[in-house]
Amino acid sequence: MLTLVFLTWHAAYVVADDKQGGLSTISHVGFLEEKAKSGDIKTQLRLGTMYRDGQGVPRNSQKSFYWFLQAANKGNVPAQLRVAKMLERGVGTNENKAAAFIWFSKAAKSGNNDALTNVGKMHQFGIGTQIDLQKAFRSYLRAAEQNQSEAQFHVAQMLYKGLGINKDMGNAIIWFEKSANQGNVDAKNLLGTFYLKGIGVPKSTDRGLELIISAATEGHPAAFHNLGLVYQLGLGVPRNDIYAYLWFAVATKSGHQSAKRFREGAALSMTPDAINTARALASACERKNFKMCISF
């Protein structure tokens, strides 16, 4: 009886003192680890997060992985997801794509959108498992039907290209629109180009520019490149070499692979002063970390 009373008092003491930012952090962590060792899943998750983020303890990815794995082995879906992602990236453990696929698949059985989307990508690109486009499509679709915007984009892409499913532009547009309406920048950018060209939708320069500008505002490299093309060709806006060079330069700096060639092409018809103006605007965008660059 005396031991039980002491344990109850000790738990209350360390938790209360921890909330006040007192000196009992070590005791508190020790108490949590004892509780986690007894099989308490919530505490295992908490410790995994603490060691991952350095909350009250030094960051330790190995200990983080260990505690997430304990909870994952008991069927906890959030823990299974974290274990899968750490295995996929080699964080706190050796990189193991095949093991990551197994854990994503376990989490996906519960219908978890994130897990389903990751399983879809691994099937589509042969990461940790063999390529199986039909399984990829089915996995994406399950997540897309639960309003996961990334999965909606992948479903749209596969319908558009006929990957793992028959080509169906009409349904592809529906899924692109759903994904874009939820803020997915890949969907916004691609759908924007469709509206500019009238691919699968009535041609609408206004709608196309609206979508591409929205994606560019969030720092999307391909959207920057498309804005360069818009100004180079004068699509719905006056043709402007400075703005064309600007957006090609921003796209290049943000990682777009072919934008540099377009930037160099735009420079051929520009004066040195115009190029310097465009470069100054591009640098201003870079200082904003490529976000909210539409208005300087």
Name what the model sees in each region.
Residues M1-L4:
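Sec-dependent N-terminal signal peptides
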Residues L7-T49, I294:
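N-terminal leader/linker segments that initiate helical-solenoid repeat arrays
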Residues Q20-L23, Q257-F296:
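Terminal, low-structured helical/coil segments at or just beyond the last alpha-helical repeat
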Residues L23-G30, P58-W67, N94-K106, Q130-R142, ...:
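Structural signature of tandem alpha-helical TPR/SEL1-like repeats
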Residues K37-D40, D53-Q55, N60, N73-N76, ...:
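Short helix-capping/linker turns of helical repeat alpha-solenoids
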Residues R46, A222-Q232, P238, I242-K253:
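Short N-proximal segments of mature Sec-exported proteins
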Residues R46-D53, V57, R82-R89, T93, ...:
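Hydrophobic face of amphipathic alpha-helices that form TPR/SEL1-like repeat modules
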